[in-house]
């Protein structure tokens, strides 16, 4: 357990591994066991969707060829219902048509082939999560900027000229004299 207060600790990114082969899921778990991720897994697209209802992951790592629902069908549904979940395909079937469909229909972050290189898989996951973190931070900062602009607009409306700055020829900021302090002429 960490000594840092709970509100300071970063939450571990949640990765959902979807593959109909237990051996593949197990190998991915072994590959990622020392990484700072919370892992969950599903043996089918339907099981993955059910898990997402109660505990949506940050990243979905899915196979393509699975019974009942293909990885591409799963990706399309996730894109529709959970657009903020990052999507990576890891499959042995890397035909151009499948790759194009995954990119266009599922908006995948990466398309990786089996057998995978552990370093490449870890890097793809890291980059995807970093992209997500940056996107979320940018959205937060944009919202903060909009809120600040609204405050300035309200201040300017209530106190015209409050946001204007006058400078002299040297560039120094001029501070207007308080009208009450000026002598009567």
Question: Residue spans of the language-model regions?
Answer:
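Two-component/phosphorelay signaling modules centered on CheY-like receiver
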Residues: 7, 14, 22-40
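Helix N-cap/capping motif at the beta->alpha junctions
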Residues: 41-50, 71
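Active-site beta3 strand of CheY-like receiver
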Residues: 55-61
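Receiver (REC) domain active-site loop signature in two-component systems and cognate sites
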Residues: 66
């Amino acid at each position: 357990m960490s000594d840092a207060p709970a509100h300071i600790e970063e939450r571990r990114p949640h990765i959902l591994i979807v593959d109909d082969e237990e051996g593949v899921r197990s190998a991915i778990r072994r590959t990622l066991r020392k990484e700072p991720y919370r892992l969950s897994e599903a043996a089918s697209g339907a099981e993955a969707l059910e898990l997402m209802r109660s505990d949506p992951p940050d990243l979905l790592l899915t196979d393509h060829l699975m019974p009942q629902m293909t990885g591409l069908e799963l990706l399309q549904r996730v894109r529709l219902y959970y657009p903020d979940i990052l999507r990576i395909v890891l499959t042995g079937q890397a035909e151009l048509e499948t790759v194009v469909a995954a990119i266009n229909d599922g908006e995948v972050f990466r398309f990786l082939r089996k057998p995978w290189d552990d370093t490449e898989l870890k890097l793809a996951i890291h980059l995807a999560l970093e992209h997500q973190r940056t996107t979320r931070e940018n959205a937060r900062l944009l919202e903060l900027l909009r809120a600040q602009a609204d405050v300035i607009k309200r201040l300017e409306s209530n106190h015209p000229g409050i946001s204007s700055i006058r400078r002299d020829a040297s560039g120094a900021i001029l501070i207007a004299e308080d009208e009450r302090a000026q002598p009567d002429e």
